[in-house]
Structures are given as structure tokens and as C-alpha cells.
Amino acid sequence: MKLTTVLVVALLVLAACQFTVTDNSGDDPENPSLRSAGENQNPDSTKTITAWATRDMTNMRRGLNRPSKRCLAGSARCEFHKPSTCCSGHCIFWWCA
């Protein structure tokens, strides 16, 4: 019984940490203190530019000239099979994380 309780508590702590990290992983220019000190503070980082270029190329292949939005913010509805439409890249139960 004691071992089961310890395992359940450990699982809950790990789940809470995962949701906290996911919630704070977005690029929030209004509150840069949420980011780690070693992270690149430039919003036009190579990773962001590469992601935008990939989405733009995908839209060109589909016949769309311009995407209506670059990505969906957190707490927005998303397509479960297309998590790349979320800014964070995570679509959990049809909501951007």
C-alpha cells in the first residue's frame, strides 16, 4: 500500500511538471522571465524561421498563397492530427498546449 501511494504521488508530480513546462514553453514576449536564462531571446531565431518556412512551403503545395495565421496560440482549438498548427507544436485533446 505504501509503495502504491509513493508511485501515485510521483506520477502526479511528474504530470504536473510536464504541464507546467508545456504551458511555459510558448514564446511570450510580454513575460520573458518565463524563459530560461540560457535560451535565445531573439524571437526571429533560426528554429522559428525554419518552422515558418516549412509551414509556408506546405501551404504553397496545397495551393494556399498565404497562411491566415502563422500558428495557433495556447488554449486554441487545433486539429489533433496536425499539431504543427499550434505555436508550441503540441495539440492535446484538440487544444493547443
From Swiss-Prot:
Covalent S-S links between cysteines: 71-87, 78-91, 86-96
Signal peptide (from-to): 1-22
Keyword Signal: yes
Tissue: Expressed by the venom duct.
GO molecular function: ion channel regulator activity; toxin activity
Residue stretch(es) of the prosequence: 23-68
Alphabetical keyword list: Cleavage on pair of basic residues, Disulfide bond, Ion channel impairing toxin, Knottin, Neurotoxin, Secreted, Signal, Toxin
Keyword Glycoprotein listed: no
Region of interest called Disordered, as start-end residue ranges on this chain: 22-46
Entry superkingdom: Eukaryota
A Gene Ontology term for the protein's cellular component: extracellular region
Subcellular location: Secreted
Family the UniProt entry places it in: Belongs to the conotoxin O1 superfamily.
Protein role: Probable neurotoxin with unknown target. Possibly targets ion channels.
Annotated domain remarks: The presence of a 'disulfide through disulfide knot' structurally defines this protein as a knottin. The cysteine framework is VI/VII (C-C-CC-C-C).
Name of the protein in its database record: Conotoxin Cal6.1b
Originating organism: Californiconus californicus
